[in-house]
Amino acid sequence: MLNYSLRPENRGKNLESSWQYMFKTYPYLKPWIDSLKQNQALKDTFIYSPDHVKLHAYYVASSRPTAKTAVIVHGYTDNAIRMMMIGYLYNKKLDFNILLPDLRDTGLSGGNAIQMGWLDRKDVTQWMEVANRIYGDSTSMVVHGISMGAATTMMVSGEPQPDYVKCFVEDCGYTSVWDQFSKELKEQFGLPQFPLMYTADWLCQLEYGWGFKEASALKQVARCHLPMFFIHGDKDDYVPTWMVYKLYEAKPQPKALWIVPEADHAHSYLFNTEEYTQKVK
């Protein structure tokens, strides 16, 4: 189960396929990306994590000088390219600087397994520091994630934050890795939590140094006192909608919640682009 979940066949490594998917799904992205490339405005940067994993991100400065900066975090088996629609929202529509990391074992980043947000929270925190340096050491920053990227965002939110971090946006993130894997085990294979979940959890602790219950967005949001905007589709059956109510309840004020009518998993922006943009704005 551990390899099935953390080392799936599709790990967001096919960049050309990712670009093709994004241009087909969001046709307005291609002229924007082409313009960025023509003007050498879409840039790559690499860093090393404390455990010596090479990590990659794309970044794009706003067309006008600004402190407003968004760090945008992708979902499970996706990569930074697959979050370019949110990059467009912030950079093209709202005039933000943006940085979009490839999480471990996706895109151009190293690593040997997906980390479900828990180790990624440390990497994203490092990327937030990098983005602040790139954009002048005096940014006003939002962190925005979708799906596993939203869980990562919430896991980040429970850590101590520098003054430049102002708020978080989580779109359809799960309560914990334990809850999400338990749900998938039951739905895909008809199996109970015991014994497989407990065995896989133990193996994850041995191999990666973290456990399924430890990797809890629910516990982390309870420690966050910065503003957070929760978004979830009411037709989401992959990360079920009930999870957002528990997360929202656990988070201290200030907070806001938007349940998006008729939206399934990770498609709230696709199906409600203008309203999504206005609410994030």
Where do the PLM segments sit?
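The serine-hydrolase catalytic nucleophile loop
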Residues: 76-90
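Conserved alpha/beta-hydrolase
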Residues: 90-110
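Alpha/beta-hydrolase active-site loop
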Residues: 114-135
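Short beta-strand/loop motif that positions the catalytic acidic residue
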Residues: 223-225, 230-232, 236
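An N-terminal hydrophobic leader/cap segment in hydrolases
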Residues: 1-47
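Hydrolase active-site cap/lid region
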Residues: 155-210
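Short alpha-helix in the alpha/beta-hydrolase fold that links the catalytic acid
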Residues: 86, 217, 226, 240-249
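Catalytic histidine neighborhood in serine/cysteine hydrolases
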Residues: 248-266
